């Protein structure tokens, strides 16, 4: 099943803005759900991206590939930066199941780390996607936040 799912997994593309409720529930974009459901996944996997200040998301196939690619070097006492990164990804990842309406409950600590409040922006990046605070996303792209940009346009 893993190899078949990895072979047919389509890329996550597009940018979508969705509301987050007080319980941390957010609707995963229908196009992202379709990619995952085509590979027979009923969950997303998320982890904090501390370098960018967002949440990274993907299908379970990514964790399976990382796990299979991880050499058993700890027993040999060998530790490399790439191996440490793989272990960080594996240990930071959380699996979030879809509810019947396509929502997931994002843990409060992940939302806080990414500065996400009432609105989240999903950004497709091929094999992975990111979940951003809208203002932080605009800033990371070198743009003024939408509210500021529209205020500045009239001046």
Swiss-Prot record:
Domain of life: Bacteria
GO cellular component, one term: nucleoid
Pfam families, A to Z: MraZ
GO molecular function per UniProt: DNA-binding transcription factor activity; transcription cis-regulatory region binding
Biological process, per Gene Ontology: negative regulation of DNA-templated transcription initiation
Keywords, comma-separated and alphabetical: Cytoplasm, DNA-binding, Repeat, Transcription, Transcription regulation
Location in or out of the cell: Cytoplasm, Nucleoid
Main location (coarse class): cytoplasm
PROSITE patterns: SPOVT_ABRB
Domain SpoVT-AbrB, chain residue ranges per copy: 15-62, 93-136
InterPro entries: MraZ (IPR003444), MraZ_C (IPR035644), MraZ_dom (IPR020603), MraZ_N (IPR035642), MraZ_sf (IPR038619), SpoVT-AbrB_dom (IPR007159), SpoVT-AbrB_sf (IPR037914)
Similarity annotation: Belongs to the MraZ family.
Protein name from the UniProt record: Transcriptional regulator MraZ
UniProt lineage: Bacteria, Pseudomonadati, Pseudomonadota, Alphaproteobacteria, Rhodospirillales
